[in-house]
């Protein structure tokens, strides 16, 4: 099969766009490769040609935006002072996702839901989450070591675990907070959420760092 480079790029993007939307809506097991290629308007053989089996397409779908997200985070980390504060680190990690969700178009909305699913599925931990996101996660945790030098190292990892849980829930925009608050809070109001997220998580990190007794390993 001989395909021109420009056509190849366009075809791959169409497949990835369709996969991202359908995986986000139905999950990995709820959509077939045939359904994805039908939504993309391409032949099934082209998905196999460019990506291989559905598992590889799923990983490629995550990786496409992970690279962009991680690059933005690295730039913000690099701009921080040598001894950053807790708020600055949380902002550098979380803001790129906020900016993409607010201004990146519907694809980023689908991606947020997809990441929320992936982060909560053990089957993808090593192949996706570890491979795509751990290097930048370690940069964040290293920064926290400098910001909170007296903290128990375990708490730096637990704090990151809690932060990721909050981010995936927030940016997935499930509507849960809308229902729970009877409309007082809106999960699509990401700017309002973010204004509360950073001080909330920073206070949590500092509280963990200040706990000296009364906690088991």
Map each language-model feature to its residues.
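C-terminal peripheral helix-coil segments that are non-catalytic and often amphipathic
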Residues: 2, 103, 134-217
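An amphipathic alpha-helix adjacent to DNA-recognition modules
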Residues: 12-17, 51-74, 78, 130
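Helix-turn-helix
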Residues: 14, 22-56, 60-64
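Short, amphipathic alpha-helical "lid/cap" segments that border enzyme active or binding sites
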Residues: 16, 70, 87-94, 160, ...
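Hydrophobic alpha-helical connector segments
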Residues: 74-111, 160
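Amphipathic alpha-helical segments used for helix-helix packing
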Residues: 87-92, 103-134, 174-179
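Short alpha-helical scaffolding segments that buttress acidic/His motifs in well-ordered protein cores
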Residues: 93, 97, 112-119, 163, ...
């Amino acid at each position: 099969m001989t395909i021109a480079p420009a056509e190849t790029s366009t075809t791959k993007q169409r497949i990835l766009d369709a996969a991202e939307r359908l995986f986000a809506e139905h999950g990995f097991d709820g959509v077939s490769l045939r359904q994805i290629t039908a939504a993309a308007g391409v032949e099934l053989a082209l998905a196999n040609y460019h990506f291989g089996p559905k598992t590889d397409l799923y990983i490629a779908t995550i990786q496409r935006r992970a690279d962009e997200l991680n690059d933005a985070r690295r730039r913000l980390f690099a701009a921080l002072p040598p001894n950053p504060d807790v708020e600055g680190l949380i902002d550098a990690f979380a803001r790129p996702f906020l900016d993409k969700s607010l201004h990146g178009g519907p694809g980023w909305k689908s991606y947020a839901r997809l990441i929320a699913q992936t982060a909560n599925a053990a089957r993808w931990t090593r192949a996706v989450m570890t491979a795509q996101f751990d290097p930048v996660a370690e940069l964040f945790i290293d920064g926290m070591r400098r910001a909170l030098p007296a903290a128990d190292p375990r708490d730096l990892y637990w704090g990151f675990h809690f932060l990721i849980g909050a981010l995936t829930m927030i940016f997935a925009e499930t509507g849960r907070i809308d229902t729970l608050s009877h409309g007082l809070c809106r999960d699509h109001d990401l700017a309002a959420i973010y204004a509360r997220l950073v001080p909330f998580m920073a206070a949590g990190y500092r509280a963990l760092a200040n706990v000296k007794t009364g906690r088991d390993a």
